[in-house]
Curated annotation (Swiss-Prot):
Matching InterPro entries: PDZ, PDZ_sf, USH2_Complex_Protein, Whirlin_HN-like_dom1, Whirlin_HN-like_dom2
Organism taxonomic ancestry: Eukaryota, Metazoa, Chordata, Craniata, Vertebrata
SUPFAM superfamilies to which the protein is assigned, alphabetical: PDZ domain-like (SSF50156)
Disease the record associates with this protein: Defects in Whrn are the cause of the phenotype whirler (wi). Mutants are characterized by deafness due to malformation of the cochlear inner and outer hair cells and by circling behavior. Stereocilia are shorter and wider than in wild-type animals and there is a decrease in the number of actin filaments in inner and outer hair cells. The number of outer hair cell stereocilia is reduced with increased spacing between them.
PROSITE patterns, per database record: PDZ
Originating species: Mus musculus
GO terms, biological process: auditory receptor cell stereocilium organization; cerebellar Purkinje cell layer formation; detection of mechanical stimulus involved in sensory perception of sound; establishment of localization in cell; establishment of protein localization; inner ear receptor cell differentiation; inner ear receptor cell stereocilium organization; paranodal junction maintenance
GO CC term, one of those recorded: stereocilium
Subcellular location: Cytoplasm; Cell projection, Stereocilium; Cell projection, Growth cone; Photoreceptor inner segment
Coiled-coil segments on the chain, per record: none
Complex formation: Forms homooligomers. Interacts (via C-terminal PDZ domain) with MYO15A; this interaction is necessary for localization of WHRN to stereocilia tips. Interacts (via C-terminal PDZ domain) with MPP1/p55. Interacts with LRRC4C/NGL1. Interacts with MYO7A. Interacts with RPGR. Interacts with EPS8. Interacts with CASK. Interacts with CIB2. Component of USH2 complex, composed of ADGRV1, PDZD7, USH2A and WHRN. Interacts (via PDZ domains) with PDZD7; the interaction is direct. Interacts (via N-terminal PDZ domain) with USH2A (via cytoplasmic region). Interacts with ADGRV1/MASS1 (via cytoplasmic region).
Protein name in UniProt: Whirlin
Length: 918
């Protein structure tokens, strides 16, 4: 191919666009003013030879998106759709040469997962090539004609370009027209009435199949259908200075969230103990001596235990332990396959420690979830359906362990065996990010009432509509759908779809003279067609879902009358019957289910106020979530601390790992700790009217002196009193979009990390999910160790300062039903105590959330250290500047500039917990 490419000529017009885009991917700017490198020229020639003009434009857009966000994972996922043949995939090695060297390792890891290896099976090749009739004698024609307008065709389909696969026949009803004409399960539909189904979404395929009485299908006998997904976790690794590096040698890539092996097998498998690799360290901790370790990892993450921080002057430093060492054994107990909490307990249990460590010289930094499609042979589908018993007239359960569910004809839901616990855990995980404790308890109450048969699906949905009253909260319905009974699924989909259509109509402009309020929602890029579909995420992205709804509104009959259903977002490819079966629309009942018991309200607002014990922090979520409303890339789960009031129904807090990937281990006597209140905010609350005023009263900016004694936080001392506050005014702020497949009105405001030292690993925001903050393993709080552990002492600083605050608000909220709090505004002063602010916001003017709302608080950032900001807060003002009328980007810029300015070492946020749209 190189010889072929060398002889190609490059037009000047296309060279400018593609060449500059490729140069941009390599980090260059102003490519038109300098000569292109040989690698860029070779890539451009290959693009000209292998891709059409529209494909080259998509490729250019893909590179521009990567250059703007530096998200390697999304770059590779997007290329999966574009480079749809082995010949086109030859562009990947050329592209690798023009991306920054620091991203090449991650690029290699993602492509090594098998996503873009040349197809080796007879099934993969026709997925995109067969639409042109390239199948070796396997393509055949199937003609279907409806006798009546509403007669069903008798088959269901699965797949779509948003899942990276073609359109496949997943079910054929016995005795149906499709069966009589020879359509079989496992057939791939290539064309419908001369319309190609290559690279079409699932919704587009459904519309093409339902748009005509007579169908001539070109099908390919693939003999299989796409099933669920296998989730692989890829870790990025850094050296002790925080620079990206390659993984340790002989470290296998995990093919799941855990690696459960016997310790002796794991030892031999990882080849960790080679000659001269390990050393023994004998530690005897005297009185007042600090162990001073920060550890990371655990068996629940498929990792060993690594040292990520060593305090200056500690016993660990004196014994030669350093950042980048892996702990293999402690007092005879292997650390190769030990849970994180067990490692913490063992390191705290004795003052005489004999450690076996290995100098690995690198650390796991961030984990990204990569999903691989699992295929189900059509023969297995037939056997499992024949051997299963189901409801009369409905299709039955499929005998496979693939996680997730898919939808059968006439609204029947084919539930897979491992769905129940997993979907409940996913729902609970997403609810922690979007809802307060009271709201989460309210939702679980209604779900429990529905599952127990106390209320109908209509009553439950109407109650959830009242509770999930913002766009982000509404996205939880995609997870709620997974626990709906099969017989209620059609009704649930119809109600949700009608609500979404009503919401969109309400937001439409009154006339053509008004700007398009959907411009940022309907903005389409290549990355939007590859929604996240891991085992702990949902399939469709917000943009895809809204575009589909808009398309249905413009091109189909009145959906409110026909009762057509939406495709739920699941972690397996959904089936949709292509039959035009009309479901009569039923009037919604006017009854409302009773509210949940009020005692749950006493647990409200204790999430941030509850003192935490070192070593018992929350685990990092397995992956970021993609919803119909918004995509979150939260670094940590927010589960209630011990002592929080239980929620009704079975709690899934124990379903996920309860141990963090980092821990703080301390031998310190609690009575000897000094109160550390450096990062506590100064809070002053006052009631406001039904709609909060954005203008802040002048006295809020200068709180009275007696405020600290009234139960609020003490004012932070001057930076000179605490060594860890030195240099707090040196910040560089970056505002970036979370993920290219998320809604464009979600920005993360954070600062670039400052200079890193060898003793502590700084947290970087990578293309994958950033793991949680490091915490310390120490034997005593000393001033010397405090100066070397800025992030490690964050939990200790909040321990004593959070015993008292928020009790008045907790008692006040106990008298109100969950989710119905009286609006109050709060002034929160956030000290610039870290290199990052660490919050992500959604909303802004001209959106469903008119004022910015906090959706993520990153651990280790200034907002987290403050302890008073929390997820769900609506930001009214920043340093006295109102955010009313500010669009999302403008609001994000205001927050970023407030953090960047050197005029003050804090930011004043006026926030509210008001639960309705302002």
């Amino acid at each position: 191919m190189n010889a072929q490419l060398d002889g190609l000529s490059v037009s000047s017009s296309s060279t400018g666009s593609l060449g500059s885009a490729a140069a941009a991917a390599g980090g260059g700017g102003g490519a038109g003013l300098r000569l292109l490198s040989a690698n860029v020229r070779q890539l451009h020639q290959a693009l000209t030879a292998l891709l059409s003009e529209p494909e080259r434009e998509q490729f250019t857009h893909c590179l521009n998106a990567y250059h703007a966000r530096r998200n390697v994972f999304d770059l590779v996922r997007t290329l999966r759709v574009l480079l749809d043949s082995p010949v086109k995939r030859r562009l990947l090695p050329m592209l690798r040469l023009v991306i920054p060297r620091s991203d090449q390792l991650l690029f290699d890891q993602y492509t090594a997962e098998g996503l873009y290896l040349p197809a080796t099976t007879p099934y993969r090749q026709p997925a995109w090539a067969a639409p042109d009739g390239a199948g070796p004698g396997e393509v055949r024609l199937v003609s279907l004609r409806r006798a009546k307008a509403h007669e069903g065709l008798g088959f269901s389909i699965r797949g779509g370009s948003e899942h990276g696969v073609g359109i496949y026949v997943s079910l054929v009803e016995p005795g149906s027209l499709a069966e009589k004409e020879g359509l079989r399960v496992g057939d791939q539909i290539l064309r419908v009435n001369d319309k190609s189904l290559a690279r079409v979404t699932h919704a587009e395929a459904v519309k093409a199949l339902k748009g005509s009485k007579k169908l001539v299908l070109s099908v390919y006998s693939a003999g299989r259908i796409p099933g669920g997904y296998v989730t692989n976790h890829i870790y990025t690794w850094v050296d002790p200075q925080g620079r990206s590096t390659s993984p340790p040698s002989s470290l296998p890539q995990p093919h799941g969230s855990t690696l459960r092996q016997r310790e002796d097998d794991r030892r031999s498998t990882l080849h960790l103990l080679q000659s001269g690799d390990e050393k023994k360290v004998n530690l005897v901790l005297g009185d007042g001596r600090s162990l001073g370790l920060t550890i990371r990892g655990g068996a629940e993450y498929g990792l060993g235990i690594y040292i990520t921080g060593v305090d200056p002057g500690s016993e660990a430093e004196s014994s030669g332990l350093k950042v980048g060492d892996q702990i293999l054994e402690v007092n005879g107990r292997s650390f190769l396959n030990i849970l994180h909490d067990e490692a913490v307990k063992l390191l705290k249990s004795s003052r005489h420690l004999i450690l076996t460590v290995k100098d690995v010289g690198r650390l796991p930094h961030a984990r990204t979830t990569v999903d691989q499609t699992k295929w189900i042979a059509s023969s297995r589908i037939g056997e499992s359906v024949a051997n299963s018993a189901g409801f009369p007239g409905d299709h039955t359960e499929e005998g496979t362990s693939k996680p997730g569910f898919y939808k059968g004809p006439a609204g029947s839901q084919v539930t897979l065996s491992s769905l129940g616990n997993q979907t409940r855990a996913l729902l609970d995980d997403q609810a922690r990010h979007l809802l307060t404790e009271q709201e989460r308890a309210t939702m679980m109450y209604y779900l429990a009432q529905y599952r127990g048969g106390t209320i109908s699906v209509e009553a439950m949905v109407m109650a959830l509509f009242e509770l999930l009253n913002t766009h982000a909260k509404f996205s939880l319905l995609s997870e709620v759908r997974s626990i709906i009974s099969p017989q209620d699924l059609d009704r649930f989909d119809h109600l949700v779809l009608r609500r979404e259509i009503e919401s969109m109509k309400a937001r439409q402009p009154p006339g053509p003279g008004v700007g398009d309020t959907y411009s940022m929602v309907s903005y389409s890029d290549t990355g939007s067609s590859t929604g996240s579909h891991g085992t702990s995420t949902t399939v469709s992205s917000a943009r895809e879902r809204l575009l589909w709804l808009i398309d249905l509104m413009e091109n189909t009959l009145d959906l409110e009358g026909t009762g057509e259903t939406t495709q739920g977002s699941t972690n397996a490819l959904p089936d949709v019957s292509v039959d035009d079966v009309k479901s009569p629309s039923e009037d919604l009942p006017g009854i409302k289910p009773p509210p949940p018991p009020p005692p749950l309200a006493q647990g409200h607002d204790r999430l941030l106020g509850q003192p935490r014990k070192p070593g018992r922090e929350d685990p990092a979520p397995l992956s970021s979530a993609a919803h119909s409303g918004i995509v979150f890339s939260a670094p940590r789960n927010r589960s209630p601390p011990p002592g929080t009031a239980p929620t009704p129904g079975p709690s899934s807090a124990q379903d996920s790992p309860s141990s963090p990937i980092y821990a703080s281990i301390s031998h310190a006597n609690p009575s000897s700790r000094k109160p550390l209140d450096t990062h506590l905010a100064l809070v002053n609350q006052h009631p406001i009217g039904p709609f909060p005023r954005v203008q802040s009263p002048p006295h809020l900016k200068s709180p009275p002196a007696e405020t600290p004694g009234a139960g609020a936080c003490l004012p932070p001392p001057s930076p000179s009193e605490h060594p860890d506050a030195v240099g707090a005014n040196q910040h560089f702020v970056l505002v970036e979009v979370h993920r290219p497949d998320s809604e464009p009105d979600v920005n993360e405001v954070r600062a670039l990390p400052q200079t890193r030292t060898a003793s502590t690993l700084s947290q970087l925001s990578d293309s994958g999910q950033t793991l949680s903050e490091d915490s310390g393993v120490d034997a005593g709080e000393t001033e010397a160790s405090t100066s070397g552990r800025g992030r490690q002492t964050a939990s200790a600083k909040n321990k004593n300062g959070k015993e008292q605050p928020r009790t008045e608000r907790t008692a006040e909220g106990a008298n109100k039903p969950p989710g119905l709090l009286e609006p109050t505004s709060t002034l929160v002063r956030v000290r610039k105590s870290a290199a990052t602010l660490g919050i992500a916001i959604e909303g802004g003017a001209n959106t469903r959330q008119p004022l910015p709302r906090i959706v993520t608080i990153q651990r280790g950032g200034s907002a987290h250290n403050c302890g008073q900001l929390k997820v769900g807060h609506v930001i009214l003002e920043v340093n006295g500047q109102t955010l009313r009328g500010k669009e999302h980007k403008e609001a994000a810029r205001i927050i970023a500039e407030a953090f960047k300015t050197k005029e003050r070492d804090y930011i004043d946020f006026l926030v509210t917990e008001f639960n309705v749209m302002l």
